[in-house]
Amino acid sequence: MCIRDSYEVVRENGEDLLIGNSKDWHQPGSGYMQYDLMQKFLFKPDDRFRHLLNFQFSNTTDIPRYDRLTDMKKDKPKFAEWYYGPQFRLMTAYTMEIADWLSADKVDFTVAYQKIKESRHNRKFGEVWLGSRNENVDVVSLSSDWMKQVDNHRIHAGIDGALNFLSSTAHKTDVDTGERAALDTRYPDGQNYMHNIEAYASHQWEITPRLTLSDGIRLGFSTLYSSFETAEFFPFLSQDVKEVKQNNMTYSFSLGLNYNPTKDWKIALALSTGYRVPNIDDVGKVFDSQPGMVVVPNPDVRPEKTINADFNVTRFKNDRFLWETSVFGTYLFDAITLKPHTLNGNTEIEYDGELSEIYANHNSRRAYVVGSTTRLKARFLEMFMADASLTYTYGDIIDGEDERMPLDHISPLFGRVGMTFQSKDDKAIVEFYSLFNGRKKLDRYNLNGEDNIGYATVLSLI
């Protein structure tokens, strides 16, 4: 890997050329712009009814994939172009709240629709074909919550569900002539959907003014279907992975205690279980995770399950001082991780013109994540607030009796420091902050997952 600040790629007269970069510390192909709009409308005809309309819109310019643009092959860039197309998101939601209805203090209903578009575009250096893979996602969701206060007990119950539809298309374009041709898709090119519905109930009991107990339960059902219609680009796929069907029942529990020994201290302990149901990204796609490695579908992936614990201590003094520290841990069963895979008895296939090792998502036996975070806030001179936080996380996959390897997606030590000015009338807020992180050592990279050790920075070698 190199820092791509010494050159950039241009195409002139049907040829890719490397030209020097005359701007020191300028990295061509590393920036983009994003636009976000949000509008809410609130209508409250009386004390019992409340109507809320929520509109959100977000879009971007093209987003260069800077890490892929640093790949080299025979002293030349591997790619002349590699970028995400505009990432489009539109959401509209309607919420109605009703007080004193159905024996509840408050009932609310929310119905929402989201449309999401994204695309990936790449062209190898010296070649004319620009590959474009496009994804369109439509999500319709409905949720309802019922709340009742009975003496020192607060009870919530409700349901929520979502219908998710995915359309995946692809083509390639000759950048010189504009000619179009077919191309393999990122996700199955047939019908793709994932639907889920869940019901929950939670309870909060103020045992004493200083001690509160909370508990809850959630039950869920999900169904998934994904199919490949065009066999032209995936002749290596067997019939059992060309059509993936899954139905999963899930459940989780939670239990927590909050204790205030004094008015300035709070101690909290929480225990819970959790789950994550495989989606089409987990079980259905074919893609090159990194050079020389191709990921194929595995319809046998099961839901991940977790046991979680969190211990928190907070010291506060009105709105002038806050110190909070927590220690957390998660134990995963059937953790979904990438592992070497065989397909029709083969461990390697040719994909996108390159011989690649075959990988697929599998349920590893166990994994764990532990860590700690601390935060400090202090107000001074009435209108200024200093804020700092620091987080450390560590995780391993336990595969077999004694075999361990790093869990991917684990961040190195990271934190934030900042300063905020807020006027006395709250009409002006100005904030300055800085984000920082430590290095991630090479031996903490997951070699088979998505940590992408090939793009590790020089600091990881120290």
Walk through the language-model features, giving the residues of each.
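Extracellular loop and loop/strand-boundary signature of outer-membrane beta-barrel proteins
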Residues: 22-27, 75-84, 95, 125-134, ...
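Face-selective signature of the C-terminal outer-membrane beta-barrel domain
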Residues: 42-58, 85-235, 249-254, 258-266, ...
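Outer-membrane beta-barrel translocator domains and adjoining extracellular loop/strand segments
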Residues: 6-7, 64-72, 119-127, 167-176, ...
